[in-house]
């Protein structure tokens, strides 16, 4: 059954969450999880919404892979939060993710535009 809220929600395309997180962190020195999700949503004009249930497990996997580091800090609102920062390995992975994404988008475009 399709719920009414499903009609207004755009999901992150499969295989792009790492790319979106890495690119968001590449633009900033460090961000906490809420800032990452908020930045993606803001830059996409509200089209892309990263759910907490997807974001934090992805960040944990990225920590394990060595793509990001994390440290505890205090937000502007005086809340305790974990701040994430891109590593050298993360910058390299961002290049890999971008190349794969561009290859897939190019292939999709060719199929759509084929006569």
Q: For each predicted feature, which ranges?
A:
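Intrinsically disordered, low-complexity serine/threonine- and proline-rich regulatory segments
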Residues: 1-16, 97
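N-terminal helix-turn-helix DNA-binding core of bacterial DNA-binding proteins
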Residues: 11-54
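Basic amphipathic alpha-helical segments that dock to polyanions
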Residues: 55-62
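Beta-hairpin "wing" of winged helix-turn-helix
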Residues: 63-79, 85
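Amphipathic alpha-helical dimerization/coiled-coil segments
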Residues: 89-115
């Amino acid at each position: 059954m399709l719920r009414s809220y499903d009609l207004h929600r755009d999901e992150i395309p499969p295989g792009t969450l790492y790319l979106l997180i890495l690119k968001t962190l590449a633009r900033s020195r460090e961000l906490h999880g809420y800032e990452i999700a908020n930045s993606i949503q803001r830059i996409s004009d509200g089209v892309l919404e990263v759910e907490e249930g997807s974001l934090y497990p992805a960040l944990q996997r990225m920590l394990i892979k060595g793509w990001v580091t994390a440290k505890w800090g205090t937000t502007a609102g005086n809340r305790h939060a974990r701040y994430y920062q891109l590593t050298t390995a993360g910058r390299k992975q961002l290049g890999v993710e971008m190349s794969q994404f561009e290859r897939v988008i190019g292939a999709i475009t060719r199929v759509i535009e084929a006569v």
